[in-house]
Amino acid sequence: MTGGAMDPLPTAPGAAAAEAEVDEEADPPAADSPVPPVSEPRAPDAGQMQVPPGNPLLLSLTLQELLARDAVQVELVPEKKGLFLKHVEYEVSSQRFKSCVYRRYNDFVVFHETLLHKFPYRMVPALPPKRMLGADREFIEARRRALKRFINLVARHPPFSEDTILKLFLSFSGPDVQNKLKESAQCLGDEFMNCRLAARAKDFLPADIQTQFAMSRELIRNIYNSFHKLRDRAERMVSRAIDNAADLLIFGKELSALGSDTTPLPSWASLNSSTWGSLKQALKGLSVEFALLADKAAQQGKQEENDVVEKLNLFLDLLQSYKDLCERHEKGVLHKHQRALHKYSLMKRQMVSAAVQSREPESMEQLESRIVQQENVIQTMELRSHFSLYCLHQETQLVHVYLPLTSHILGAFVNSQIQGHKEMSKVWNDLQPKLRCLFVGPHGAPAPPRPPQDGLSAH
């Protein structure tokens, strides 16, 4: 990727200006600089990827295997009042670790930061926003759902699931989990520092990795856009189901109120008093079915919220984390690599300028030493760039492992619609016979309902 990067560039007229620019150029961040030499053996963290047989670049996972790694529940704990603010606390229980711990939102924030520090080249899902004041129940519930999606994506992610910080977050029940997480992050470097494959990542990459990366990024962007629209439509359908439930319930209550009315009839209507009494009794009885219809509609809306909308949100969170990773790759390691190359070229120009001006040997030696140091920095950047592409390739595979989840979501939606309409239809059919008493014939006998005549039809 950087062929000829260390070759000296042609001498430019502005060598003196270049020399000044070298001195002003910032060194690459510490996270990318201190690495052991390539030839020096490095003991990996116990939880890091080991070298599997075959090509370690390829993942051999199924969706079922991913989902079986863990199932983490996040539930709200009853509010605890602080001196000024109410604190929201979550009960986090892991099936895998058989643990149950209590976490605050800020604990999730530190955990998220630790993941980004340790796994900068992996998909780290975003956290929901923090809202200090005026957090209503709806916001708190939405944030709980988002935190549950976040921790489940992390707990099932191959490298994350084997790392000690995940176990620490899910099982440590001590008083200060945040300090424990920070201490863990300070003791160890990032994944590049601890992975035994990091120095050889380039050997496993396909020759057209850049083309593959561009194509995958475009494909996943399109998938994200489509599923974002599907999620929005699904949310609207759930909202309509809940509104329909509320309307049916009110409809039934109004029928019940009408049937319970005790206002006496005027004398001129006394001839029809028996008819009105029968109608009231029938209307009052219909409210039971409408309450049942409302309950069925609410159940369908709730089921689709959990089985369709929430799973679509999980899938979108995953895709968004992939998009964020692509941006980190381009704006992070690639940008730092280009800066290191630029700084190196300026040093080489400065070297040529110093030779022309016949500077003292000591200053030349210092400059040569700085150039050697910069060459080491560039070598590290190249290794990190290749390792970043290596991780990106694996994360792309992981997204494709999750793709069958979309068929599960669609199946859940269809089944919910079938079941919901089936149950609603049964209640409507049970209600129909009760309507017969509402239609009284000329001699007081019940008459079957008939469609309205054209002259009475609504226009």
Swiss-Prot record:
GO MF terms held by the record: phosphatidylinositol binding
Family annotation (Pfam families): PX, Snx8_BAR_dom
Superkingdom: Eukaryota
Region (Disordered): 1-53
PX domain: residues covered: 68-176
Primary location recorded for the protein, binned into one broad class: membrane
GO cellular component assignments: cytosol; early endosome membrane
Annotated membrane topology: Peripheral membrane protein
Positions with a binding annotation for a 1,2-diacyl-sn-glycero-3-phospho-(1D-myo-inositol-3-phosphate): 104, 130, 143
Keyword set includes Transit peptide: no
Subcellular location: Early endosome membrane
Keywords, in A-Z order: Endosome, Lipid-binding, Membrane, Protein transport, Transport
BP GO terms, sorted: early endosome to Golgi transport; intracellular protein transport
Homology family: Belongs to the sorting nexin family.
Role summary: May be involved in several stages of intracellular trafficking. May play a role in intracellular protein transport from early endosomes to the trans-Golgi network.
PANTHER family: SORTING NEXIN-8
Record's protein name: Sorting nexin-8
Native species: Bos taurus (Bovine)
